Design a protein with these regions (language model features):
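Domain-length cofactor-binding catalytic modules of enzymes
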Residues: 1-185
Length: 185
């Protein structure tokens, strides 16, 4: 992405050109890298709890893919979003919230997409200023759910604090009331 923006800025690319094909090849490589990382994390987690498992869903987010909307073919860039054309999708909560397993209901209203999580309340650059007078890094290293956060980066622990995110329950209820999902778990 850095090489692309250095050369083209934030301008779009014309489909089927060398530049577009180069971008998509690098994009697909990044998606594959992310998939392998997810599988490695899952494998390591299962090893730690001495169990085995089967992948039931593996969905990318933050991607570009061809899409037809309103009878028009084009490209859809999902930033902070995940495709809705899968059987089941995980909508992650923040470090302080539960995550949800949902069945998407495809809709052009949502651009065939669902949010990838609750979304931020504040920009990353604002988090430490808003939270450091209320919480120490040590206090943020434990969540309301009892999780332990291991993070040596004191800026990042504020950026990713549960307080920096919207409530996942509100986001899930909004999608459910709009008919975009069925909650599974």
């Amino acid at each position: 992405l850095r090489a692309h923006t250095e050369q083209f800025g934030h301008q779009g690319l014309v489909a089927n050109t060398d530049a577009a094909n180069d971008y998509l090849q690098a994009h697909d490589h990044a998606l594959n890298y992310a998939k392998l990382n997810r599988h490695l994390i899952g494998h390591r987690m299962m090893e730690q709890i001495h169990t085995q498992g089967t992948v039931i869903t593996d969905v990318n987010h933050n991607l570009v893919e061809p899409c037809e909307l309103y009878n028009q073919q084009g490209w859809l860039h999902r930033k902070g979003a995940t495709p809705a054309h899968h059987d089941i999708v995980v909508i992650p909560g923040s470090r302080g919230d539960h995550s949800y397993l949902v069945k998407p209901i495809i809709s052009e209203l949502s651009l065939h997409s669902l949010p990838h999580g609750a979304g931020r309340k504040w920009m990353r650059t604002e988090c430490k200023g808003r939270l450091s007078h209320r919480f120490t890094p040590l206090q943020l290293s434990r969540t309301a759910l009892g999780s332990r956060i291991i993070c040596a980066n004191k800026q990042l622990i504020y950026e990713e604090a549960p307080q920096s995110y919207k409530s996942i329950e509100t986001v899930i209820e909004s999608m459910r009331s709009l008919g975009l999902i069925e909650v599974i778990a």
